[in-house]
Amino acid sequence: MGKFILDSQFAPAGDQPQAIQKITQFIHNGAQYSTLVGVTGSGKTYTMANIIANLNIPTLIMTHNKTLAAQLYSEFRGFFPKNHVEYFISHFDYYQPEAYIPRRDLFIEKDSSINEDLERLRLSATTSLLAYDDIIVIASVSANYGLGNPAEYLTMIHKFEIGQEEAQKTLLLKLVDMGYTRNDTIFERGNFRVNGEVIDIFPAYNEKEFIRIEFFGDEIERIGVFDALERTALTQLESFVLYAANQFIVGAQRLQSAIKNIEVELENRLEEFVSQDKQIEYQRLKTRTEFDLEMIKESGICKGIENYARHLTGKKAGETPYSLLDYFEQKGKPYLLIVDESHVSLPQFGGMYAGDRSRKEVLVEYGFRLPSALDNRPLRFDEFINKAPHFLFVSATPAQKELELSQEHIAEQIIRPTGLLDPLYEVRDADNAVLDLYDEIKARIAKNQRVLITTLTKKMAEELSKYYAELGIKVRYMHSDIDAIERNHLIRALRLGEFDVLIGINLLREGLDLPEVSLIAIMDADKEGFLRSETSLIQTMGRAARNVEGKVILYAKKITGSMQRAFEVTDYRRTKQEEFNRIHNITPKSVQRNVEQELKIESSGLSRLYEKASKKIPKSERESIIKELNIKMHQAAKALEFEEAARLRDEIARIRTM
């Protein structure tokens, strides 16, 4: 079994040593649920890393949004550079699920756009899970959604060995069964190509390397690893294991069984519609399902094939669907599931099932889908919370649910390694908030510090951003329409000083590690509600706890109950921290953290790879690269993807001028 090797120049400090020791002991003693109550800036992520290293078991870390997942992915890759750290979030750039609105007789077709890089990372996560024990997967709520059967996925692997006897035709058919596509013109992820007795395979889960299998007759003579950009040999292998091109691969026998079961279900459902005299629903379901069945018989896939997941995976009606957690269980060993920011993540996990169910029940009732489509769903909360052998809930403000589950298995982490105290806070009159805050912003900019402002409405955030920009402040506005990658870019740009003030609504609370921020301004702090609850206020105020000059200004007309309770928690923690510093003669210092490289994810993996390494492209290779890009450019234009076509055109022009 691979061993986790934690790489850090720091030793645990503050409350970290006792928290690490307690949680490790809880889990060693068999506790299924434990909670780490850690104040903002106390190094909860580093504590988590130490716990993982101590336990030395596969670990899944789940959080409620993609921004935090990206941040955790960067941090854990830094902590465990010699181990396998993977990333598993939704692979959609855009997703509109199918739905039916009866009162308007409006059917909305499913519409989506898959991000190829995110798909590759998801595949990398599942293949690594089956191949390695020293693995950490950072995931969003996507981990709770349906995946293919991991046991079936394991049957869809192929091992190559030097000296192995295998007819080339047989191998090519096997590659197609595994989801790979032959393409002798454009060679990219998920493709293979054939040139005489040489077969090149580009694993769907690999970004930079492809495999070359060289035959002598029907015998494998050589196995090589090649750089996908430079087409140069990297190393020779004695053997190589290839995994399927997607997680929903189904063997021929299972597929035939699924088709038969779908036909039986369709027949039964149509009989129900006849008995209920529902002619429209009858015709609708018959037409749609028979079309899908024809597509599955011909090509093994159809649009919306996930709605037949129950049949394709061999599950029974109502049975728990397969998810990423089953890939951990497939290993047959204990594993740890960490729920980061659990006070937000757990309620979100709990709400996923109900929303999905209500939408699909309408589709089933009106004949758009078979009843089995209801089993293509996220895990219910009761299924999720009993799935893993060991849960660790991590939060500065855990909810009652986590505390009840954990009982006595709770560790506190209030003392920060840096000696930093919970921030000072001040309540100011809301009437003069905008001008008063402008003066505070100018003072912070003069010290090369950053400011976060949280508002209650999108309109106020937009107007405030526009107003301060007109006054010469470098300000940006983070709103809910910004995708995960752009949010990550904004946060990084703030840290680098490309702008000084970031304004948002509820996007500035959990998990944002911003040592450069010394001022948090909370507008309309006295407006009771979700965004100004005790928990939300504590979390928001905590964003200023990574800077020695951290301060929070709450603009309000009165002090609400939520504000008062948040102040009491802050005062309690600050008193305890001051006492610890006094006893140990500690002088508080701001957190020092490098600005990690951005998670490089774009819509066109091929173009990005060429752009990233264009300076390395040998002159002799440029024409072949230009040829490939030119084909992709015309394909994009034909598909009316003009922005992508223009980007590829510019890339071609740039390579030609090198």
Curated annotation (Swiss-Prot):
ATP binds at residues 38-45. GO terms for biological process: nucleotide-excision repair; SOS response. Keywords: ATP-binding, Cytoplasm, DNA damage, DNA excision, DNA repair, Excision nuclease, Nucleotide-binding, SOS response. SMART domains: DEXDc (SM00487), HELICc (SM00490). Residues 623-658 form the UVR domain. It is found in: Cytoplasm. Residues 433-607 form the Helicase C-terminal domain. Pfam families: Helicase_C (PF00271), ResIII (PF04851), UVR (PF02151), UvrB (PF12344), UvrB_inter (PF17757). InterPro entries: Helicase/UvrB_N, Helicase_ATP-bd, Helicase_C-like, P-loop_NTPase, UVR_dom, UVR_dom_sf, UvrB, UvrB_inter. Residues 25-416 form the Helicase ATP-binding domain. A motif (Beta-hairpin) lies at residues 91-114. GO terms for molecular function: ATP binding; ATP hydrolysis activity; DNA binding; excinuclease ABC activity. GO terms for cellular component: cytoplasm; excinuclease repair complex. Forms a heterotetramer with UvrA during the search for lesions. Interacts with UvrC in an incision complex. HAMAP family: UvrB. NCBIfam families: PRK05298.1, uvrb. The UvrABC repair system catalyzes the recognition and processing of DNA lesions. A damage recognition complex composed of 2 UvrA and 2 UvrB subunits scans DNA for abnormalities. Upon binding of the UvrA(2)B(2) complex to a putative damaged site, the DNA wraps around one UvrB monomer. DNA wrap is dependent on ATP binding by UvrB and probably causes local melting of the DNA helix, facilitating insertion of UvrB beta-hairpin between the DNA strands. Then UvrB probes one DNA strand for the presence of a lesion. The beta-hairpin motif is involved in DNA binding. Belongs to the UvrB family. This is UvrABC system protein B. It comes from Helicobacter hepaticus (strain ATCC 51449 / 3B1). The lineage of its organism: Bacteria, Pseudomonadati, Campylobacterota, Epsilonproteobacteria, Campylobacterales. The gene is uvrB.
